[in-house]
Amino acid sequence: MIREALQKLVGGEDLEQHEAEAVMAEIMDGEATSAQIGALLAGLRLKKETAAEIRGFARAMRARAEQVPTRHELVADTCGTGGDGAQTFNISTTAAFVVAGAGVPVAKHGNTAVSSRCGSADVLRHLGVNLDLTPAQMGACLDEVGIAFLFAPRLHRAMQHAAGPRKELGIRTVFNILGPLTNPVRPRVQVLGVFDAAVAELVADALAGLEVERAFVIHGAGRLDEVSLAGPAQVWEVRPGSVRAGILDPVDLGFERADVESLSGGSPADNARITLEILHGASGPRRDAVLLNAGLALLAAGRAGDAAGAVRLAAESLDSGAARERLTRLIEFTERCKHVEHDNRL
């Protein structure tokens, strides 16, 4: 199938969803050569990916990911694409604890740094979270603690077949936007930040055809893959089979304007400190950004009727200590997993 796909791309034609799914299946199953994979990725980048192609790729990757069992029917994720280059602190990771503290289970899908100095895995490791869990342990953590970190390399082992070509190409490819769409838990609720507005719209269209109940795809002011305080954010509300574009201005929710630099982070140690400060009650633009992004997840989960109410719930999660407690319990649970043999049992 990949040869046929390359012929279409050379001619400037788009792939149908089923064709994209079949091509990604070949890649993930080790049936495509490095040259073919590199040509496909470069061809897609030159042509520009479509929502149908992205959706097809995501479906194939989901099907081949190691599954994470959970008893929760409604699970949220706050994973974004990264790649905005803004070097902010880990906003969506901090927001995940706020969402979990408000009672919505969170399966945080993530990895080490892509374009920043500190990815979600980096900051969590520095906070004391053990990332070396089996899929069964991840699921048990989600059920017991209400939040779990799903370390992408552990769950998407078939990605090894594309690792070499991606590294050799040295350019952004479709894989850079597939991470948030390939969470093995298949969360029904998502807040998904994207580094580019045009790509965000594509991602929203792709997500509408996957298993989602309600999601918000966002592109923040200052070209962030988060809602920022620098200005209005572009927001795409996603429901099954439909996408509605809109604008979210933090000022309308009572927040003060702040420039992107006020959200700056640094090394894993710096970002871990910032996360702890917020969870322990620090005020200011960083807290506000976390409230905004967590509020969107709570709104998508149906915990509030509007954005203002959702932000209030997020503030309660922080101020009551519930968000901080989720981090403490996550650290304790994953520490216990160090002393259990990796045989898919706890």
UniProtKB/Swiss-Prot annotation:
Keywords: Amino-acid biosynthesis, Aromatic amino acid biosynthesis, Glycosyltransferase, Magnesium, Metal-binding, Transferase, Tryptophan biosynthesis. The lineage of its organism: Bacteria, Bacillati, Bacillota, Clostridia, Thermoanaerobacterales. 5-phospho-alpha-D-ribose 1-diphosphate binds at residues 80, 83-84, 88, 90-93, 108-116, 120. Mg(2+) 1 binds at S92, E226. Homodimer. Pathway: Amino-acid biosynthesis; L-tryptophan biosynthesis; L-tryptophan from chorismate: step 2/5. GO terms for biological process: L-tryptophan biosynthetic process. Its EC number is 2.4.2.18. HAMAP family: TrpD. Anthranilate 1 binds at G80, N111. Its cofactor is Mg(2+). GO terms for molecular function: anthranilate phosphoribosyltransferase activity; magnesium ion binding. InterPro entries: Anthranilate_Pribosyl_Tfrase, Glycosyl_Trfase_fam3, Glycosyl_Trfase_fam3_N_dom, Glycosyl_Trfase_fam3_N_dom_sf, Nuc_phospho_transferase. This is Anthranilate phosphoribosyltransferase. Binds 2 magnesium ions per monomer. The keyword Ubl conjugation does not apply. Anthranilate 2 binds at R166. The gene is trpD. SUPFAM superfamilies: Nucleoside phosphorylase/phosphoribosyltransferase catalytic domain, Nucleoside phosphorylase/phosphoribosyltransferase N-terminal domain. It catalyses: N-(5-phospho-beta-D-ribosyl)anthranilate + diphosphate = 5-phospho-alpha-D-ribose 1-diphosphate + anthranilate. It comes from the Bacteria. Mg(2+) 2 binds at D225, E226. Coiled coil: none annotated. Catalyzes the transfer of the phosphoribosyl group of 5-phosphorylribose-1-pyrophosphate (PRPP) to anthranilate to yield N-(5'-phosphoribosyl)-anthranilate (PRA). GO terms for cellular component: cytosol.
